[in-house]
From Swiss-Prot, chains A, B:
HAMAP family: Hydro_lyase (MF_01830). Its EC number is 4.2.1.-. It comes from the Bacteria. Transmembrane segments: none annotated. Keywords: Lyase. It comes from Bacillus pumilus (strain SAFR-032). SUPFAM superfamilies: PSTPO5379-like. This is Putative hydro-lyase BPUM_0381. InterPro entries: D-Glu_cyclase, Putative_hydro-lyase, UPF0317. NCBIfam families: PRK05463.1. The lineage of its organism: Bacteria, Bacillati, Bacillota, Bacilli, Bacillales. Belongs to the D-glutamate cyclase family.
Amino acid sequence: MNIYQTYEPSQIRELIRKKEITGPTAGLAEGYAQANLMIVKKELAFDFLLFCQRNPAACPLLDVLEPGDPVPRKSAPKADIRTDFPKYRIYRKGILQEEVSDISAYWEDDMVAFLIGCSFTFEHALMLNDIPVRHIENGHNVPMYQTNIACKRAGVFHGPMVVSMRPIPAHQITRSVQVTSRFPSVHGGPIHIGDPAMIGIANVDQPDFGETSVIKEGEVPVFWACGVTPQAVVMHTKPEIAITHAPGHMFITDQRDQQLGVL
Amino acid sequence: MNIYQTYEPSQIRELIRKKEITGPTAGLAEGYAQANLMIVKKELAFDFLLFCQRNPAACPLLDVLEPGDPVPRKSAPKADIRTDFPKYRIYRKGILQEEVSDISAYWEDDMVAFLIGCSFTFEHALMLNDIPVRHIENGHNVPMYQTNIACKRAGVFHGPMVVSMRPIPAHQITRSVQVTSRFPSVHGGPIHIGDPAMIGIANVDQPDFGETSVIKEGEVPVFWACGVTPQAVVMHTKPEIAITHAPGHMFITDQRDQQLGVL
């Protein structure tokens, strides 16, 4: 429980814009969909849009903004994606150059912003089904791993899929597949269930992003495609400039989680 | 029942290529997904891809081919979209100029082909649920209508949604919503249920494309977004050149219908 749990999305965004909220956004404005960010120049926008279309589990699109337009007219028409994430990452030629809390100074008229669905939506649905979500129970960021699963290439964009992991009690795995499959626009059903080595994860206790989740007796690690994938792709593709959110520091949209369910 | 019902997709495509099959493809290679076609020049490809992303009910993408590549490497890697539809339409500046059975002579290195999901997939699922599909029962093309529902604009592309109509017995409407919602990549659940006038259809017995379906006592007209929408959009947007399939004359992919179900 946190004091911001029951705030409206617009209230949270205002606090973020004023830099009164600067940390991870899990649990804020509960019930509203949060989003990952990827910004590229217009000349790469077709390739990246095609990359998302070909890799819908990792990069499910909630909103694609008009070139040069920082306002997400579909998902939060009064917001501004240059100021409404708590933390951003600036990548130049695939290298993380800096983390900032406002990208107004970096924004250019030929940039295109992509908002990508976030697993926080289905975590709420898991908990409503009495399926435990360890990193929320323990109050830390979700563990994320680079895998040996290659994303489908599109134009210049290619790279490995990043996944998030949740330990699920064995008897609840089927239900966790059902619950998350309802939400394809926030990564959908799991990518992998069980042995981490099969998808190239050497040590499940050493995530590449986020923090370790303890796997208890009788639990199985279950892996979902993750919206941090574009950052791994940027590191491989090395565009002149790309701007993303910092993992866990998301954008809160005006769309309710339940509106994203396919049935 | 038709003699081609049990053929493999590759066999049907070969007969189409040899011009031994030249008519509508409904019921051919049953159980395999069929696709609508839209081809635009590379300079418009980002706008059209964004249009599809913003209008997923009307334009659910099964495959987007590389610029200049006529081979659908994801959905039918041994096919050629220039020869494997029975009939194509060539639009210049939004005007239908001609219908041809092969577009090899029109193909250019900077063209991008989009394969869009087709309702034939969910019709099979409806029938497996004992929900009647009138135009299949009566052996004619599905009735399609231009509506007053505006698609969401993307770049230069805008225009009205085209829908297909199936008369459904009132007590089976809920089930028809459930069954078709499983298949968002072939238009998903209905766009409208009931009074045709509410979506701008003046006379349900006079479709804009295809042929009339009789609505029996106790049945309600149910409308689904239709992959002919890009043709209405081309008429509004008037690009120099666009190539589509002729309504009902689809491409047969190697993907099974059931592989497109989200759950």
